[in-house]
């Protein structure tokens, strides 16, 4: 069996996976970075340290499950495909990927974390054919909230045109700050999602859009956080599942 090794060391997860296209098989190992209770993030130096500790462990676990041949290695090297987009935490994955590819004498490819999000979404949705056609993508995470027009690109897989972005908070930041108000561990997305699944109430929250130009709208998320803060102030953590 032959596969492709992927590595991602972003905030706040160490991730590695092997993809075998002939068998449509994905083996993955990932682990959240440890964030102290009550904290709303990590310094980049701490993130690099934890990635450096966790990545070898995950690669060992992945190797124990995959006994095949690695054809190539891919690694995330920046948050986005934009000038000046940089975070030190990606150096941990890049260093490991360079060493592995060099030792195995296989090709090494660099992609942005955002491209990885988009590719993973297409795979999960069963829309791999979209790699060959233009489509719209919404990247909603802790560090990015953007609407994109995505086109195929032979060199980078995707060419992205920014259509809209948040002006203040990113969606993930709002989620994590609300989670912090409720005393949930950081990052709070998974725990808030669990609480939401238990809720029988429905909330209709629409982002407010403001167009700088006809093709480049912007939207604010801070008002949504204020709404959630007000809600959080009226409930206890015990009853949080009834409101979120």
Predicted feature locations:
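A short helix-loop
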Residues: 2, 9-10, 27-28, 129-133, ...
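General beta-strand structural signal in soluble alpha/beta enzymes
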Residues: 7, 75, 108-113, 169
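Acidic, glycine-rich active-site loops and adjacent beta-strand->loop/helix elements
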Residues: 13, 76-81, 112-118, 144
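Short, well-ordered amphipathic alpha-helical segments that serve as non-catalytic structural scaffolds
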Residues: 29-31, 50-65
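Activation-segment/catalytic-loop signature of the eukaryotic protein kinase fold
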Residues: 237-244
């Amino acid at each position: 069996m032959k596969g492709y090794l992927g590595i991602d060391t972003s905030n706040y997860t160490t991730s590695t996976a092997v993809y075998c296209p002939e068998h449509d098989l994905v083996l993955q190992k990932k682990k959240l970075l440890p964030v102290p209770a009550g904290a709303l993030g990590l310094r980049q130096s701490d993130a690099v340290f934890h990635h450096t500790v966790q990545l070898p462990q995950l690669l060992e676990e992945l190797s124990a499950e995959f006994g095949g041949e690695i054809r190539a290695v891919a690694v995330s090297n920046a948050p986005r495909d934009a000038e000046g987009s940089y975070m030190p935490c990606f150096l941990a994955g890049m260093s490991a990927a360079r060493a592995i590819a060099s030792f195995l004498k296989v090709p090494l490819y660099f992609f942005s974390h955002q491209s990885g999000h988009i590719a993973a979404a297409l795979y999960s949705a069963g829309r791999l054919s979209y790699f060959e056609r233009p489509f719209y993508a919404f990247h909603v995470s802790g560090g990015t909230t953007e609407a994109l027009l995505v086109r195929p690109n032979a060199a980078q897989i995707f060419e992205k045109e920014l259509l809209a972005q948040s002006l203040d908070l990113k969606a993930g930041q709002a989620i994590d700050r609300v989670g912090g108000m409720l005393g949930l561990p950081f990052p709070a997305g998974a725990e808030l999602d669990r609480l939401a699944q238990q809720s029988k109430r429905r909330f209709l929250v629409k982002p407010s859009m403001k167009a700088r130009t006809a093709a480049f709208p912007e939207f604010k998320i801070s008002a949504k956080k204020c709404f959630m803060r007000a809600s959080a102030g009226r409930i206890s953590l015990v009853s949080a599942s009834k409101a979120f």
